[in-house]
């Protein structure tokens, strides 16, 4: 009781006992009420510890308040008690419980008003864009503030990582807040590589723009002076409006928010794209029985973001569906939390819940409580538990020093001094907190308590110096320890001033020396001669014992040697007394909290065997790391393990330790990549002084989150399992762990932040452990700043070794070579080889790609062609003549060194593009002619058929994105193309909304469109109706044309396809026509290729068509669907399809469309019933808005017996639908039933058994299916009933999926029926007879009949086979006249029989076989029986 009564103490307890239970009553609150309240909280799964603070009481009140209306008297009493306790904690004066409740209500009303006011302020503030505001300049005019490179980078990163998942929409909405149409088009341009998605977006924008123009017609008459014109749809999309016009509309009075309107259109298009990529309904998101609640919530909100609904509806979905669709374990907890629970509270409450593991933990917890109670009752008292022992030797709990397995520490276990044991120690206080002293030359560094806490990698407790009070007995009892530790760095020799015998001397602190050796000093005391060995040989010294030495205010007494030493040395015999340690600095910054993924545990992978030399190498490496504090030993209580191994360093005999963290990486939480890419020197501004630094042992300088360290455990085995393996865990960021880069970058950024704020004139580029520091200061001043930076980093535990400290140019940084006024890539040497392997060529291409960013003209296309196909890395690849020529050209380019210059923000960016031929392009970005910032190349072909203008557009897009990332703005382009050619192409290209600023530059070869297709039919020109057909089996085909002037032609083709024949027909028409021609085709494939106006292709046939198109003056190409009603096409179709294809005209299209509008048949059913090609049937389904809500369900035949049915109840519109599915065929019987009772289920089962052969029904464990009525019906109809596994939807998988499919079909036909029961039967009919697919391409109705008929035939056949097997056969082989047998008779046919003689199976003609009945053993072998008992 004492523990629970400690909720209040001192004066608060007195106040508590003065409060009356009721107004005017005699009874007052006592300690027993607190004890009762804490026990009640246990009952309601709330933490009793919350009662100890006002904040905790407030949390309890929030949880209990929703249950007051419907709760029991105990809940109300508990609420009143906690409310009174809250007032006592807050020192609110009250006389009784009623006053406490009034005070609580007053506080809650006040908080609610404040929250509403804050929400109102937030709404008011949200009206103004905070992201890209249109700000006013000094003249009061509105000016535009463009998107930042960081915003565009974030947008590109989201698309790359999320790939149009639902998260993309809120991210786009957030990033584009307040953006103008021009900003929005820039965002779309940066992801223009996603052509299919962008085409869908373009269509949506065009539709919305057309709708805008329809709703907002243009006013007749001229615009009044000073009045702004009204925006059209194309103006809102940024196509026909300028930036100034957009600003004018957005800031006018009244404003027209063209940016928000355009943004809304884009979001509509993004929603369509998201639905295509993520066709999952929110109703289908249910938590699996063993699925962690966090994963379920992630899936739920991902689907919710893709839903087309208002925010109110989405809020309702979150409040109801999230709980409703959780698994039973989580649902129980969520309902107990109440309706007002936040998502964070739900996730905390449900953490680790679900599955057998959760049930095992609950059971174990209950059992442990029972066990503990029994033990305490057996003891008969409530004394404290047995005190945990602690080892004097290793400091760990659980054992004493006598049983310690660790190596025995030198000196006394009590005080740490050498020369005596613990039993002889005179110290009064044991010093478990060993000293952690180090020395600094000038002044001690003050560390904050937080920094001190993180300073030790192995223990998070602060370490106290000898003589200071222990944390528990500090001056103020708070456990703080003085942390004025002297410290000295190792940038130079660690020399300190010492006092010995009243004399001052300078000495070197040497952790490698055993003894203290000094020279030129006289000590007035006894000594004895001694010989010691050193680096220079042996020297004679005088040994003085018990000599006092004072170093940095610390005193020590020990042995001192005096002799001719080159330098005074303080050895370990003195350093250990002073508590001096050699500290490898580990950053004192706060650790970043890290967790495993929800529901996952750490890796438990066994260590694989290692060779002796690897074990020795790992043992040595780990011993050094342990001494440095990077790792520490763990015992058997840590159950986790990750394999470790060793490899030899490149070109070295030294070993390197590697830990295989792949499994831990899978289980560790995800991290956001802090840095989106590496910095580029072309983006650096020219600086007067530059320094490049490298952080040494980067990862090993940052501490790992303490609670996560146990998961990094690894084991070093012993040879032949001689001893148990030595187990370690990491205290710092491990190499190879997925979180190390992100945490290091984050830590480094925090550390550099104060230095950057203090020194804004210093530019620091940080990428992992590489630092580029630039300034316009004079060199001496700059170096002082560098020294200050290095000291700042060292304070936080980051060393910057002299070895990698670059003070003078050229600076080697990130693979680049930096000079004061120029930069280049580090020298590249191309190898000279006779034989090239795949790996050699890969490395060569990598080097050339790296060089191409500053060396213009580099080409790699022919070299890359050598790598096509699946080849091993060691395969020898002969260089083609083209590849040799390309390599020779590249070598010539690399002979002369080329340099780039630095960026000047005051000058304009210019990008110039040149065509190199063979689909290769090169470009330079510069600010002054012949002084390139950087260069690059482009050699991608995104499609098989392309043209130069399209490729140039792709180059422009790549350069624009690259420039935005490096400089934050797009350059002005100089392109080798005439403006008319460019604008002709871009008019039809989707990105017409964003055209960069550019000018024509006459750099041969120029880009041009070699031909142009007409938009309207050419009057007077001959019209060619073309068609082609191919037989899939024979690969033969025909192509031909018919003209409006009576000409016709057909050619036969071999080894062809339908697509090739369609293209060949167009080629024939072009070849045989005049300079002007109209061509009509029915091939969307051919039309798509030619309308893109390619001037090169991978297809020889398309190249021939291009050659013919270039010769023409005018060409008009048109498409007609299915040739219907077009005479010319009807004629040519008959010509080319004769003997090639059976169905030519698709007369069934209208009937199929009518059928689909009524029944919403799937494409297979329509293709089968109306003889339609699959592409046409699919197009009918695709054009139906009701069939595009979700992807079409795939139906397959399950391997189950013909008599098995699955039954389940589903709910729709508040009514119950009982569904039965024939498992083998997918056939459905369903009807709406009045109530979910056993009687209704039994009646339905009897009806089902009267229609179909039902042998087994499989149901869930619902009360209706486990009722006596259902059991009786099953007994009467001789049906076996089986039950599913509780909470496992997979056990009812067939009927569960059919429930979804049935609801989907009901949704498609619901508006055709007044009542739900009618719609259900219509949906059953459609599913059973209007949807085809699966094995055999049958509908479900056809399939069940086929299965039952086949089953009957099989059974009858089996009876015949059984009957036949009662006969034996005597037979003759070919010319052998002797009868053989008897043999078994597996099968009897009309002209032959199948016999089995021993293990051999033969087919024998009936005329050579005699079949007799098997009468038993006595008749076997009797020759005459063969004649008498002949069955024939």
Swiss-Prot record:
| UniProt keywords, alphabetically | Activation of host caspases by virus, AIDS, Aspartyl protease, Capsid protein, DNA integration, DNA recombination, DNA-binding, DNA-directed DNA polymerase, Endonuclease, Eukaryotic host gene expression shutoff by virus, Eukaryotic host translation shutoff by virus, Host cell membrane, Host cytoplasm, Host endosome, Host gene expression shutoff by virus, Host membrane, Host nucleus, Host-virus interaction, Hydrolase, Lipid-binding, Lipoprotein, Magnesium, Membrane, Metal-binding, Modulation of host cell apoptosis by virus, Multifunctional enzyme, Myristate, Nuclease, Nucleotidyltransferase, Phosphoprotein, Protease, Repeat, RNA-binding, RNA-directed DNA polymerase, Transferase, Viral genome integration, Viral nucleoprotein, Viral penetration into host nucleus, Viral release from host cell, Virion, Virion maturation, Virus entry into host cell, Zinc, Zinc-finger
Chain location of the short sequence motif Nuclear export signal per the record: 16-22
**Region of interest: Interaction with membrane phosphatidylinositol 4,5-bisphosphate and RNA:** 14-33
Which stretch carries the motif Nuclear localization signal? 26-32
User: Residue ranges of region Interaction with Gp41?
Assistant: 7-31
Q: Where is this region: Interaction with host CALM1?
A: 8-43
Q: Name one GO molecular function term.
A: RNA stem-loop binding
What segments bear the compositional bias annotation Basic and acidic residues? Answer: 460-469
Q: Where are the zinc fingers (CCHC-type)?
A: 389-406, 410-427
Q: Which residues form the Reverse transcriptase domain?
A: 628-818
Q: Which residues bind Mg(2+) 3?
A: 1208, 1260, 1296
Ranges annotated as Integrase-type zinc finger: 1147-1188
Q: Which parts of this chain are annotated as the region RT 'primer grip'?
A: 811-819
Tell me which residues bind Zn(2+). 1156, 1160, 1184, 1187
Which ranges does the entry annotate as DNA-binding region?
1367-1414
| Domain Integrase catalytic as annotated: residue spans | 1198-1348
Activity regulation, in the record's words, is: Protease: The viral protease is inhibited by many synthetic protease inhibitors (PIs), such as amprenavir, atazanavir, indinavir, loprinavir, nelfinavir, ritonavir and saquinavir. Use of protease inhibitors in tritherapy regimens permit more ambitious therapeutic strategies. Reverse transcriptase/ribonuclease H: RT can be inhibited either by nucleoside RT inhibitors (NRTIs) or by non nucleoside RT inhibitors (NNRTIs).
Q: Where is this site: Essential for RT p66/p51 heterodimerization?
A: 985, 998
Q: Where does Mg(2+) 1 bind?
A: 694, 769-770
Motif Tryptophan repeat motif boundaries = 982-998
Could you say which residues bind Mg(2+) 2 here? 1027, 1062, 1082, 1133
For region Interaction with host AP3D1, the annotated ranges are 12-19
Q: What is this protein called?
A: Gag-Pol polyprotein
Q: Species name for this entry? A: Human immunodeficiency virus type 1 group M subtype J (isolate SE9280)
């Amino acid at each position: 009781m004492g523990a629970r009564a400690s909720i209040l103490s001192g004066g608060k307890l007195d106040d508590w006992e003065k409060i009356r239970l009721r107004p005017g009553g005699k009874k007052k609150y006592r300690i027993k009420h607190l004890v009762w309240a804490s026990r009640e909280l246990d009952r309601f799964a709330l933490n009793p510890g919350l009662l100890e603070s006002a904040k905790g009481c407030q949390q309890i009140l929030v949880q209990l308040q929703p249950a007051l209306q419907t709760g029991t008297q105990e809940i109300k009493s508990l609420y009143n008690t906690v409310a009174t306790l809250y007032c006592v904690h807050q020192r609110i004066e009250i006389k009784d419980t009623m006053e406490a409740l009034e005070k609580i209500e007053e506080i809650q009303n006040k908080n609610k008003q404040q929250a509403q006011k804050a929400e109102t302020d937030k709404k008011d503030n949200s009206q103004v864009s905070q992201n890209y505001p249109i700000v006013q300049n000094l003249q009061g005019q509105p000016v535009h503030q463009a998107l930042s490179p960081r915003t565009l980078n974030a947008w590109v990163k989201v698309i790359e990582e999320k790939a149009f998942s639902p998260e993309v929409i809120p991210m786009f909405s957030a990033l584009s807040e307040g953006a103008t149409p021009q900003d929005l088009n820039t965002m779309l341009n940066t992801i223009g590589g996603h052509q299919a998605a962008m085409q869908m977006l373009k269509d949506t924008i065009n539709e919305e723009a057309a709708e805008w123009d329809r709703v907002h017609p243009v006013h007749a008459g001229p615009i009044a002076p000073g009045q702004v014109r009204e925006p059209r749809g194309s103006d809102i999309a940024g196509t026909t409006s300028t930036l100034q016009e957009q600003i004018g509309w957005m800031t006018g009075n009244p404003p027209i928010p063209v940016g928000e309107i355009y943004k809304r259109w884009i979001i509509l298009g993004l929603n369509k794209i998201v639905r295509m990529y993520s066709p999952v309904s929110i109703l289908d998101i249910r938590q699996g029985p063993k699925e962690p609640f966090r994963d379920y919530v992630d899936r739920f909100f991902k689907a919710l973001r893709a839903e087309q609904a208002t925010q109110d509806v989405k809020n309702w979905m979150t409040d109801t569906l999230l709980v409703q669709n959780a698994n039973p374990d989580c649902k129980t907890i969520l309902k107990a939390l109440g309706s007002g629970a936040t998502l964070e509270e739900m996730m905390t409450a449900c953490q680790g819940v679900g599955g057998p593991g959760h049930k095992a933990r609950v059971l174990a917890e209950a059992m442990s409580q029972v066990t503990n109670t029994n033990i305490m009752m057996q003891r008969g008292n409530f004394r404290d538990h047995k005190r945990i022992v602690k080892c004097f030797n290793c400091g760990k709990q659980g054992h004493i020093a006598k049983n310690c397995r660790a190596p025995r520490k030198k000196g006394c276990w009590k005080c740490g001094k050498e020369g005596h044991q613990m039993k002889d120690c005179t110290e009064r206080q044991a010093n478990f907190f060993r000293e952690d002293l180090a020395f600094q030359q000038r002044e001690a560094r003050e560390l904050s308590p937080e920094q001190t806490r993180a300073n030790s990698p192995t223990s998070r407790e602060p370490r106290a110096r000898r003589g200071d009070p222990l944390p528990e007995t500090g001056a103020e009892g708070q456990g703080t320890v003085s942390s004025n530790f002297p410290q000295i760095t190792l940038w130079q020799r660690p020399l300190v001033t010492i006092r010995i015998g009243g004399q001052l001397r300078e000495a070197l602190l040497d952790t490698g020396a055993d003894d203290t050796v000094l020279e030129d000093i006289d000590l007035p005391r006894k000594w004895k001669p001694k010989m010691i060995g050193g680096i220079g040989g042996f020297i004679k010294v005088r040994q003085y014992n018990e000599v006092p030495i004072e170093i940095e205010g610390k005193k020590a007494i020990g042995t001192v040697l005096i002799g001719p030493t080159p330098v005074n040395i303080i050895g370990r015999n003195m350093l250990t007394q002073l508590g001096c340690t050699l500290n490898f600095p580990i950053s004192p910054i706060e650790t970043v909290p890290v967790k495993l993924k929800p529901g996952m545990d750490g890796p438990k992978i066994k260590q694989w065997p290692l060779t002796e030399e690897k074990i020795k190498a790992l043992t040595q490496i780990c011993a050094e790391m342990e001494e440095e504090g990077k790792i520490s030993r763990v015992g058997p209580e840590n159950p986790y393990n990750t394999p470790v191994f060793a490899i030899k360093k490149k070109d070295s005999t030294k070993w390197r330790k590697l830990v295989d963290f792949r499994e831990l990486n899978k289980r560790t939480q995800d991290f956001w990549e802090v840095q989106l890419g590496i910095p580029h020197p072309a983006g650096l501004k020219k600086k007067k002084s530059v320094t490049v630094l490298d952080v040494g042992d980067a990862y090993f300088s940052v501490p790992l989150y303490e609670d996560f360290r146990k998961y990094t455990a690894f084991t070093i085995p012993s040879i032949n399992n001689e001893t148990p393996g030595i187990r370690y865990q990491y205290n710092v960021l491990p190499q190879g762990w997925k979180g190390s880069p992100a945490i290091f970058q984050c830590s480094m950024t925090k550390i550099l932040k104060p230095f950057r704020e203090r020194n804004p004139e210093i530019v620091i580029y940080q990428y992992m452990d590489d630092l580029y520091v630039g300034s316009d200061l004079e060199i001496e001043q700059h170096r002082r700043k560098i020294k200050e930076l290095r000291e700042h980093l060292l304070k936080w535990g980051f060393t910057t070794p002299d070895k990698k400290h670059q003070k003078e140019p050229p600076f080697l940084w990130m693979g680049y070579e930096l000079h004061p006024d120029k930069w280049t890539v580090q020298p590249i040497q191309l190898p000279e080889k006779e034989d090239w392997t795949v790996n050699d060529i890969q490395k060569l291409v990598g080097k050339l790609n790296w060089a191409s960013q500053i060396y213009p003209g580099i080409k790699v296309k022919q070299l890359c062609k050598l790598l096509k196909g699946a080849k091993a890395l060691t395969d020898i690849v002969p260089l083609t003549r083209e590849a040799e020529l390309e390599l020779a050209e590249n070598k010539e380019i690399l002979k002369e060194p080329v340099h780039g210059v630095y960026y000047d923000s005051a000058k304009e960016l210019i990008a110039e593009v040149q065509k190199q031929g063979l689909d290769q392009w090169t470009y330079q970005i510069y600010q002054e002619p012949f002084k390139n910032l950087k260069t690059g190349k482009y050699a991608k072909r995104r499609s098989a058929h392309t043209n130069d203008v399209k490729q140039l557009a792709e180059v422009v897009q790549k350069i624009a994105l690259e420039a935005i990332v490096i400089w934050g703005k797009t350059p002005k382009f100089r392109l080798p193309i005439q403006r008319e050619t460019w604008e002709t192409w871009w008019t039809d290209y989707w990105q017409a909304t964003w055209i960069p600023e550019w000018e024509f530059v006459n750099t041969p070869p120029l880009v041009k469109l070699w031909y142009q297709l007409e938009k309207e039919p050419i009057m007077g020109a001959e019209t060619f109706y073309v068609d082609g057909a191919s037989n899939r089996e024979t690969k033969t085909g025909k192509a031909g044309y018919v003209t409006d002037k009576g000409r016709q032609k057909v050619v036969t083709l071999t080894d062809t396809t339908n697509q090739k024949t369609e293209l060949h027909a167009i080629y024939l028409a072009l070849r045989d026509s005049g300079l002007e021609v109209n061509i009509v085709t029915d091939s969307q494939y051919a039309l798509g290729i030619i309308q893109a106006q390619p001037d090169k292709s991978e297809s020889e046939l398309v190249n021939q068509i291009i050659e013919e198109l270039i010769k023409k003056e005018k060409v008009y190409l048109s498409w007609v669907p299915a040739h219907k009603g077009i005479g010319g096409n009807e004629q040519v179709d008959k010509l080319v399809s004769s003997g090639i294809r059976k169905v030519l005209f698709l007369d069934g299209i209208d009937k199929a469309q009518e059928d689909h509008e009524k029944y919403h048949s799937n494409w297979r059913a329509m293709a089968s019933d109306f003889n339609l090609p699959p592409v046409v049937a699919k197009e009918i389904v695709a054009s139906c808005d009701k069939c595009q809500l979700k992807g079409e369900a795939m139906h397959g035949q399950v391997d189950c017996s013909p008599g098995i049915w699955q039954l389940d109840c589903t709910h729709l519109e508040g009514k119950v639908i009982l569904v039965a599915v024939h498992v083998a065929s997918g056939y459905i019987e369903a009807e709406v039933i009045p109530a979910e009772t056993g009687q209704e289920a039994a009646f339905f089962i009897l009806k089902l058994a009267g229609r179909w052969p039902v042998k087994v029904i499989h149901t869930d464990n619902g009360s209706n299916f486990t009722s006596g009525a259902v059991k009786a019906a099953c007994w009467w109809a001789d049906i076996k009933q089986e039950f599913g596994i509780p909470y496992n939807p997979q056990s009812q998988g067939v009927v569960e999926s059919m429930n979804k499919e049935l609801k989907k079909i009901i949704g498609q036909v619901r508006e055709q029926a007044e009542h739900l029961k009618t719609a259900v039967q219509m949906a059953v009919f459609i599913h059973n007879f209007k949807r085809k697919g699966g094995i055999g391409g049958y509908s479900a109705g056809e399939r069940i009949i086929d299965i039952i008929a086949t089953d009957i035939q099989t059974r009858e056949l089996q009876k015949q086979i059984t009957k036949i097997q009662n006969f034996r056969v005597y037979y003759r082989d070919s010319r052998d006249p002797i009868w053989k047998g008897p043999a078994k008779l597996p099968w009897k046919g009309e002209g032959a029989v199948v016999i089995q003689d021993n293990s051999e199976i033969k087919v024998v003609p009936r005329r050579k076989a005699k079949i007799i009945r098997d009468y038993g053993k006595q008749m076997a072998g009797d020759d005459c029986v063969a004649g008498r008992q002949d069955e024939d």
